[in-house]
Amino acid sequence: MRVLTFRDVAVEFSPEEWECLDSAQQRLYRDVMLENYGNLFSLGLAIFKPDLITYLEQRKEPWNARRQKTVAKHPAGSLHFTAEILLEHDINDSFQKVILRKSGSCDLNTLRLKKDYQRVGNCKGQKSSYNGIHQCLSATRSKTCQYNKCGKAFGLCSIFTEHKKIFSREKCYKCEECGKDCRLSDFTIQKRIHTADRSYKCEECGKACKKFSNLTEHNRVHTGKKPYKCEECGKTFTCSSALTKHKRNHTGDRPYKCEECHKAFRCCSDLTKHKRIHTGEKPYKCKECHKAFRCCSDLTKHKRIHTGEKPYKCNECGKAFMWISALSQHNRIHTGEKPYICEECGKAFTYSSTLISHKRIHMELRPYKCEECGKTFKWFSDLTNHKRIHTGEKPYKCEECGKSFTCSSNLIKHKRIHMEVRPYKCEECGKTFKWFPDLTNHKRIHTGEKPYKCEECGKTFTCSSSLIKHKRSHTGDRPTSAKNVAKPLGGSQTLLNIR
């Protein structure tokens, strides 16, 4: 039995065929060929590096004059291994995964499928290549022969012997990371495994990428170019994979299902991230603060807290942001867009968080509870301010008189005493006020609105303080000090001006 070579599992294209592939299919081809070579290398079958791999590593076209002539002269001489062929003829599950993991459901229409296979099937030499894959992969499961210099194991003694000859002929280089001996031709590849070499760098922000295709996609963040357009809704995307995911919004397709909770996802990466919720795995760790994250994108965002990087810039005002979501929200200030609408009252909001807070007005939901006194609040900020009543903390201090306050809003109001600022102006008569509630009460003089009604006699008033004064005519209550002043029934202000 002859040894399996890279040519047995390679896909070769003529220039005409290569031009028929789009950029995504060309990237897929590069990734699959490099991975196939990597698998042969790990099995000890890649004795020499093929020209095709050299071309792909240098990001050149995967053909030259010699290959072009060979393909033209022998059209059946190059095997066209595709996911469809591998599945149809059941070559081997392990080998199929190498292709399927990269190609997924991609439909490479330009590859010659069944016709080529039928034509190649008549050739005994090519059939032996398929059989060679079977025999090689079956044999490597046991891996009975291991070479102590480099640690590689082999299922076939003939391959093991051939591998030993290579080390006897060539000078070996020892990897400092794992201690393996490598030939010079493979030493760079071995180093990249440990260092995760990122050779493509963005000139705008300095970000490094492993692949040139990743750098091309990243550059679109800066240029704003979105060449991939959805035919359904017209939305555009920077990369083809994002468009593929988006299309599933229209089709409702969720092909990736969690075996634990049966939740389905539109893309495989989302399922992988979701599984970590069940396993508790957090493989991405910050070197600065050692905080761990479930997905790489979360770690990337987190790192900006330490570096201060703000890669997302507003074209209108030049303000920069750490995250693209923050930029998207900021842009609504310029556009006036308010996409979040309350179903109860129809009021629109710029941010989803504001809508969630607003909904509590209709629901009377008070999710934040004080552990000291049991009082509940609609908003967390109100609970935080309330807790300071128990702790006595007053972190907001006036620089003019030294008076301190429990919340920042009270300090802002207090500062107006020193500044004599009256920021609230009546549009009807031009009168100004220090406090917004005073302006609200004043406006009712012009509108005639009297929302505060006495339950005893039915008389109505423009402000809550007037109602409180009136109620005393029924009760006969005459407070003589500020301590005896009752709190307003219809508002949140404390009555301070009654003597």
Swiss-Prot record:
InterPro entries: KRAB (IPR001909), KRAB_dom_sf (IPR036051), Snail/Krueppel_Znf (IPR050527), Znf_C2H2_sf (IPR036236), Znf_C2H2_type (IPR013087). The keyword Protein transport does not apply. A zinc finger (C2H2-type) spans 143-167, 200-222, 228-250, 256-278, 284-306, 312-334, 340-362, 368-390, 396-418, 424-446, 452-474. One of its GO terms (biological process) is regulation of DNA-templated transcription. It is found in: Nucleus. CDD domains: KRAB_A-box. Keywords: DNA-binding, Metal-binding, Nucleus, Repeat, Transcription, Transcription regulation, Zinc, Zinc-finger. GO terms for cellular component: nucleus. The keyword Oxidoreductase does not apply. Residues 4-75 form the KRAB domain. GO terms for molecular function: DNA-binding transcription factor activity, RNA polymerase II-specific; RNA polymerase II cis-regulatory region sequence-specific DNA binding; zinc ion binding. Belongs to the krueppel C2H2-type zinc-finger protein family. May be involved in transcriptional regulation. PANTHER family: GENE, 32687-RELATED (PTHR24388:SF96), ZINC FINGER PROTEIN (PTHR24388). This is Zinc finger protein 727.
